[in-house]
Every structure is written in structure tokens, then in C-alpha cells.
Amino acid sequence: MDVSIIIVNYNTYDLTSNAIKSVFHSKTTFKFEVILIDNNSSDYSIERLKDEFKNNVKFIENTANLGFAKANNQGIRLAKGRYILLLNSDTTVEPDTLETMVHFMDNHPNVGAAGCKVLLPDGSLDKACRRGFPTPLTTFYYVSGLSKLFPKSRHFNSYHMEYLDEDEEYPVDCLVGAFLMVRREVIEQVGLLDERFFMYFEDTDWCYRIQQAGWINYYYPRTQITHYKRGSSRGRPFRITYEFHRAMKLFYDKHYRHHYSFLVTLFMYTGIALKFALTVSRDLLWKMANRKSSSATPAVKEQAKGVSAGQ
């Protein structure tokens, strides 16, 4: 077996079905398997997916939502491929994507993990697909807005690396878990995903450990996927916001805290707490405004339409 493709599903039948279909529409000369882990979906998506792909996909059904890292690890343990590909359920691959990436990995034995270009539905680059590690200084530039103010600066925008050409290939610190191809021997060396990360930063942590072990993480944009990023919509549940900021703190504690002074750690904790509070407040205000808008009378709604149309 050459590639084991691991997809985690949680209440996303349409997206997951499209992702799997795009995989089976691939033009490949190698053998691959698809392993789908369902995190206790409540929308009957697992039943529909099993009916649709029962002869072509291996299924793991969980009785609880175990999170992204733990579910992927279940798939990795079952996988037989030389390469393990983490593929988000809200993505679609191009017909040449798998072939291109396997060919690249076969010809670059020093590369431990690779990712392709990841595009959003509007055709713009998903900036998460090639990143620097979130050091305290990098995080400060990102949170303070300096990275947006100087997007082409290698110094101020070392997180999203917008100073680099998105169509050129190069080593990077971090790739995105939406499409992350890793060698089996790398996983045997550095271990599985850290299951303390429920749904964010598990890819960042993995890439950090891969790089620390002497392997290269590589951005290879000779092929691409589309990432629909369903979970990034506004009005997101509180749990998602909480898990993101909890994972941010966990990553800092795991890899950076012992390198920095108490004052730097205090700064990081304060920054994470403030960002969490601001995000929750913003989402709450958005929900309240949305609720108020939906409860408006038909006459008010028509008047609002007229104003927005310039009537």
C-alpha cells in the first residue's frame, strides 16, 4: 500500500462525500486506501457514507466526539501505506494531486512532511497552508496587526509568510492538517498526533516535532486542493473558540515556556486571554445583531432592503 488517506467526519455528509469522491476520481498509478473515522455524528451522515462507499472505504465509528487528533490517530494505527495523508472532510483534491505529491515525496527522501497549495473557494490562498511557528515574537506581530500592516516583511510577517511567492516551492516550518502527507518512518520516529490538542494546533505541534527530529516540512504548490473551511464561519460555537485558545496555550507551554522568562510567559497568557475574551464578545454581539435582524417586522425588513439598495 502506498498511501493511506485519513478523513474525519463529524456531521458533514455532503462535504465528506464530495471529498471522498474527489479522491476516487484521482488519476493515480499507485495503490491507496481511504479510512474514515466518524466522531459520533448526529446527522446520520455515517449511515449514508457507509451505504455510499461501503466497498471502498474502511470505517471507524466512535461513540463520542474524540476530537481531530485522536480520531486521526485511530486511522493512522489502522493505516498500511508508506505515506499517511491527513485530509480534511471539507476539502476536494484535483485529479493530479495525489500522484503529484507521492512522486515528489518519492524523489525527496529528506522531506518528512509535505503539503500542496490550498485554495479557498474564492480562489485565494488559504494562508494556513505554509506558516512559521508561533513564537512569542511572531505571535505578537500577528495579534498586534503588524503582520497585516507589513505583509511582505520577512520580519513582521514570518507567520503567514506572505513575503514568499505562493507559486514557488520551499521548506517551511508548518503545514496545515487539511492536507498533510507524512512518511510512515517519520511517524514511527516522532510519534502520533498529540491527543491533548482537541481540534487546533495538532498539525503545528506535529510539524514542530518533525522538524526538531531533523526532517524537512515542504510546501509544494505544483498541485492544489480546495478547502471550504466550513468550521470557520462566524457565529461559531463557544467550544470551538475555547479549544482554539486552549490549544494556543498548550502549544506555548509544550515548546516555548521553558525557553522564556516569566514576563514573556505572562505576556503570552495575557494576550491569549484577551484574544479569547474579544473573540467571544465579538461572536456574542454578532449573534445578538443577527437575532435582532431576524425578529424585525416585514415592513422594517423591506425598508432595510430599500436603504441597502440605495432606494
What are the residue ranges of the model-derived segments?
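A conserved acidic beta->alpha catalytic loop
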Residues: 22, 38-47, 64
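Glycine-rich, basic loop-to-helix element that forms the pyrophosphate-binding segment
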Residues: 61-79, 100
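Conserved donor NDP-sugar-binding/catalytic core segment of glycosyltransferases
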Residues: 94-128
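A short, conserved alpha-helix in the catalytic core of glycosyltransferases
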Residues: 164-224
